[in-house]
């Protein structure tokens, strides 16, 4: 089964509400939808970045250029079922650009799994679970609004784990915000925070213990991504778990963080690792080092979220669950099928491949004008 064509489309999908982070406020998400055609079948994938190149080194525009001009010409005519060969060829031809590679890798996995009438989870080893506890992100910037949102989520049994974005205000203001939320949800929910690199080491060393005292269970990426030493010291000094996100940008970074046990948990993201196989490798590094895996998100659409669900469903352990909330943050979906959240968990989609199919009318509607 030879690859006949690889096409890319940039779509811009508005969010239901602004998402305030330490570095930007997200009003829309841009994705590159990839379709790989072979043997009468089409596999779909997705690449993107939260807030564009502000968060990382890629954007929808660079992803499309890299695929159209370098990766697609390289892979057309190759065996669509040889996932290892495709991955090696992409890595040899293009340095970095992991989200672009991930989009193709996901599409090839979807294509092969559909051809074999398997789910991607079954293709890569089989499921350890068919649903995953899912955290909701509270990022309106308004304490009362965030509390109302959390209480509604608990009442409707959608979420009982909440991640609060910090770093846009002073640490003292953030702490009061957290205390109010923790008090409001009580023992009905857990609270974690994401600083998105917003603090230096000194600030983090002062405020993380106070967050722990307030009842926070996990602190995500408190310091800049390159400061592995600060992460290690903060992990050693504090009882609350430290989670690496932006620092986890490659298999080699996973090795360095694991070697020094610089963090307690890894936030896995397919786009950060270059695809499914590399994400599984990072999870294996974490397991070997006694570091927990966490199901991270790039605010993926239903396509990327389904792919992540298939990967996370195969992992031995996910003690902190996942945060695959992209489809519910967006104002619309790009697939014919919805994903399901029930009893505080997101459920693995049924069917072959990803278990979701593109809604081509929606894709056309959100396609960026040339």
Curated annotation (Swiss-Prot):
SMART domains associated with the record: MR_MLE
Pfam families hit by this protein: MR_MLE_C, MR_MLE_N
GO molecular function: chloromuconate cycloisomerase activity; manganese ion binding; muconate cycloisomerase activity
Pathway: Aromatic compound metabolism; 3-chlorocatechol degradation
E.C. no: 5.5.1.7
Name of this protein: Chloromuconate cycloisomerase
Catalytic residues (UniProt): 165, 323
Keywords, comma-separated and alphabetical: Aromatic hydrocarbons catabolism, Isomerase, Manganese, Metal-binding, Plasmid
More info: Chloromuconate cycloisomerase II is highly active toward chlorinated substrates but retains diminished activity toward the non-chlorinated substrates.
Class of enzymatic activity (EC top level): isomerase
Record-listed Mn(2+) binding positions: 194, 220, 245
Species for this entry: Pseudomonas sp. (strain P51)
GO biological process, one term: 2,4-dichlorophenoxyacetic acid catabolic process
Family listed: Belongs to the mandelate racemase/muconate lactonizing enzyme family.
Catalytic activity: 2-[(2R)-2-chloro-2,5-dihydro-5-oxofuryl]acetate = 3-chloro-cis,cis-muconate + H(+)
Highest taxon in the source lineage: Bacteria
CDD domains documented for this protein: MLE
Cofactor(s) needed for function: Mn(2+)
């Amino acid at each position: 089964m030879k690859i006949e064509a690889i096409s890319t489309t940039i779509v811009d999908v508005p969010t239901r509400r602004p998402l305030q982070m330490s570095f930007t406020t997200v009003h829309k998400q841009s994705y590159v939808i990839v379709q790989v055609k072979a043997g009468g079948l089409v596999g779909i994938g997705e690449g993107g970045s939260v807030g564009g190149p502000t968060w990382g080194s890629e954007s929808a525009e660079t992803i499309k250029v890299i695929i159209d001009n370098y990766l697609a010409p390289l892979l057309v005519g190759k065996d669509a079922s040889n996932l290892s060969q495709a991955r090696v060829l992409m890595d040899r031809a293009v340095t970095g650009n992991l989200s672009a590679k991930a989009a193709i890798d996901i599409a090839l996995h979807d294509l092969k799994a559909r051809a074999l009438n398997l789910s991607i989870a079954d293709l890569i080893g089989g499921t350890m679970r068919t649903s995953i506890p899912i955290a909701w992100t509270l990022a309106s910037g308004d304490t009362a609004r965030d509390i109302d949102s959390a209480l509604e989520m608990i009442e409707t049994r959608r979420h009982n784990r909440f991640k609060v974005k910090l770093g846009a205000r002073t640490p003292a203001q953030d702490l009061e915000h957290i205390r109010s939320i923790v008090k409001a949800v009580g023992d009905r929910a857990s609270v974690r925070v994401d600083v998105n690199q917003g603090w230096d080491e000194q600030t983090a060393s002062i405020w993380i213990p106070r967050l722990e005292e307030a009842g926070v269970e996990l602190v995500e990426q408190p310091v800049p991504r390159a400061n592995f030493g600060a992460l290690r010291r903060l992990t050693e000094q504090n009882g609350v778990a430290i989670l690496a996100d932006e620092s986890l940008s490659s298999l080699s970074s996973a090795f360095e963080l694991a070697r020094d046990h610089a963090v307690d948990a890894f936030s896995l993201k397919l786009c950060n690792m270059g695809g499914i196989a590399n994400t599984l490798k990072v999870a294996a590094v974490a397991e070997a080092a006694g570091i927990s895996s966490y199901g991270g998100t790039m605010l993926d659409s239903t396509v990327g979220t389904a792919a992540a669900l298939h990967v996370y469903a195969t992992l031995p352990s996910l003690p902190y669950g996942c945060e695959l909330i992209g489809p519910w943050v967006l104002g619309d979906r790009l697939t014919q099928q919805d994903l399901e959240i029930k009893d505080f968990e997101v459920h693995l989609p049924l069917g072959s491949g990803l278990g979701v199919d593109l809604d081509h009318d929606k894709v056309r509607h959100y396609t960026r004008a040339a």
